[in-house]
């Protein structure tokens, strides 16, 4: 219906898809920087959220009934912060700087979760809030950066390829996490349930 409406308005028809569009996109270095940031960023967040409640119980001694509350701060924060950071990007630009700040925050968060310090619930909460800032900051600058390096007629293909790369990461990283946990982090079995030493 939308295409018919656009045709009725007399707008130029879109150019048909061509295989050389893919070649153009995958030979663009900027595309690969954004695609790799996307796969690394989302692979460091989404699989982490899957294991975060168990991390809260095992490492930070959070009551299992409340263990999902701390990781639950992440999407709540994203609802509030992502539009604010998007507005900031629209006003000042500086997409590469914003993405770099968010990526450094993400590295800091995972480093703090990995170090054996301050194994208390309030520390985990603060670190999760910092992760919420990173989780909002990077995408609000990353997705609008794609049209700056890819022509409009190839944007659909570029976004599809970015999601294709991202899904490879989202498939592989949980397997890697599970392998690491089973190989190096197994604790004792308690009440018939395997525990892990984070």
Located regions from the model:
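A membrane-interface helix-boundary motif in multi-pass transporters
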Residues: 179-198
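Helix-to-loop junctions at the C-terminal end of transmembrane segments
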Residues: 81-94, 181
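Small-residue (Gly/Pro/Ala) motifs that create kinks and tight helix-helix packing interfaces
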Residues: 53, 85, 173-181
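Loop-to-transmembrane helix entry/capping segments in MFS-fold secondary transporters
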Residues: 64-65, 152-162
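Juxtamembrane intracellular "pre-TM" segments in multi-pass secondary transporters
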Residues: 2-33
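MFS transmembrane alpha-helix packing/gate-lining sites
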Residues: 77-81, 165, 169
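Extracytoplasmic gate region of multi-pass secondary transporters
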Residues: 28-79, 139, 143, 173-174
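C-terminal transmembrane helical hairpin of 12-TM major facilitator-type secondary transporters
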Residues: 95-145
